């Protein structure tokens, strides 16, 4: 019995040693396979660290592409050639008479060009994307100064007047708010008489720009 017990003990010890050796071989093989997959030599000790660094670099590259796209969208400003002559652009737009003309403006300079037009025998409606520089309410009238959506305080301001018997959103009178304005140009008063105002953003501006591009393609 004692001899049998000793033999069983020896076999158990041999089995444990075999399992340990197999486990060690598998670990070594796994390490070598991982090194081969990443193209690393066997002397590389900081595999995990290099792998993490690779992922971080890849993430930075993705961020740089996103930032470039963002930069292109926000820093690019719409520029166009001169407006067509009024007589050549009588628009048949719902709500406007046959003697009216609609000008969609994306820059302060374009609105100023409309004010400088010599021909004043037509009613000119302006759709204008801008930012609020200041707003002051006097009774039922709100007096606005609109600035360029891209240049901000560096641009000249357009003086506008909006008559409203109802309360409007405080956002529409907050400085730096981007808005879309529709108004009638008054050459005599040098003022834009607003008939509609709403909040806007760069996406709407660019969508509108692509729809009403006046440049010759």
Curated annotation (Swiss-Prot):
Q: What's a GO biological-process term for it?
A: meiotic cell cycle
Q: Which domain of life is it from?
A: Eukaryota
Q: Which UniProt keywords apply?
A: Meiosis
Physiological role: Has a role in meiosis.
- Protein known as: Meiotically up-regulated gene 37 protein
UniProt lists the gene as: mug37
């Amino acid at each position: 019995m004692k001899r049998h017990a000793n033999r069983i003990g020896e076999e158990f010890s041999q089995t444990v040693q075999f399992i340990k050796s197999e486990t060690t071989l598998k670990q070594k093989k796994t390490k070598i396979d991982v090194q081969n997959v990443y193209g690393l030599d066997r002397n590389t000790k900081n595999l995990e660290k290099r792998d993490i660094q690779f992922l971080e670099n890849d993430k930075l590259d993705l961020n740089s592409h996103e930032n470039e796209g963002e930069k292109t969208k926000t820093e690019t400003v719409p520029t166009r050639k001169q407006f067509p002559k009024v007589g050549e652009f009588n628009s048949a737009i719902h709500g406007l008479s046959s003697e009216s003309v609609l000008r969609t403006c994306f820059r302060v300079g374009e609105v100023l060009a409309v004010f400088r037009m010599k021909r004043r025998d037509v009613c000119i409606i302006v759709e204008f994307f801008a930012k609020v520089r200041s707003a002051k309410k006097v009774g039922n009238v709100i007096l606005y100064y609109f600035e360029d959506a891209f240049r901000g305080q560096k641009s000249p301001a357009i003086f506008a007047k909006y008559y409203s018997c109802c309360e409007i959103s405080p956002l529409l009178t907050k400085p730096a708010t981007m808005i879309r304005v529709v108004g009638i140009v008054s050459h005599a008063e040098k003022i834009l008489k607003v008939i509609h105002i709403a909040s806007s953003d760069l996406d709407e501006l660019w969508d509108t720009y692509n729809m009403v591009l006046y440049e010759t393609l």
